[in-house]
């Protein structure tokens, strides 16, 4: 029987969870931290707010948001991989944060009422879901009117030369890094496939608008290796 994308992705992240953080830094040359900081600066996150971090993984962004909003705010991190959440919970404990809750759940059907969160974030997760539009609509649904979505993910560079280097790196080098550092050649081969198939920046911005978001914009990082898209849920008239 053919394995669904959801089943395949779940299997990948359950296996690579122990080495995920180290591999993130190896693959991106630690640039993922810089990209997240650039995004946070542009978000202008307010203290004491309510945040949902979708596909939170090992909770890097959940922790950054929790530190930014302060003890009066609250962050809920959601992921469908229990093994990734286990790593994340240890990191939250080490950071001594009491305003973070990590829960098991599916981004395709967020277990929250409409209009629940001031901010929704998703970092390097959208490309791995079975249906991009379904997840975008779900994130729109749970945002409060006036709330903001920020999505960081890999993208498609269009600079001649750099595009070819980027594609070759993800296709040939990244799986080898996965084998060497994490004994996971097959899993990192899959991750480069999901990167290659993910929509480019302009198309993803259109999808944000189709899902209902307003004031959509995006910035590229490192020559288009990744991008952050921002969108707002319009305030009720």
Curated annotation (Swiss-Prot):
BP-aspect Gene Ontology terms: menaquinone biosynthetic process; methylation
Binding residues for S-adenosyl-L-methionine: 58, 79, 106-107
Domain of life: Bacteria
The UniProt record lists the keyword S-adenosyl-L-methionine: yes
Keywords noted in UniProt: Menaquinone biosynthesis, Methyltransferase, S-adenosyl-L-methionine, Transferase
Keyword Methyltransferase: yes
E.C. code: 2.1.1.163
Chemical reaction(s) catalysed: a 2-demethylmenaquinol + S-adenosyl-L-methionine = a menaquinol + S-adenosyl-L-homocysteine + H(+)
GO molecular function: demethylmenaquinone methyltransferase activity; methyltransferase activity
Pathway: Quinol/quinone metabolism; menaquinone biosynthesis; menaquinol from 1,4-dihydroxy-2-naphthoate: step 2/2
Family membership noted in the UniProt record: Belongs to the class I-like SAM-binding methyltransferase superfamily. MenG/UbiE family.
Biological function: Methyltransferase required for the conversion of demethylmenaquinol (DMKH2) to menaquinol (MKH2).
Matching HAMAP family: MenG_UbiE_methyltr (MF_01813)
The protein's name: Demethylmenaquinone methyltransferase
Species this chain originates from: Listeria monocytogenes serovar 1/2a (strain ATCC BAA-679 / EGD-e)
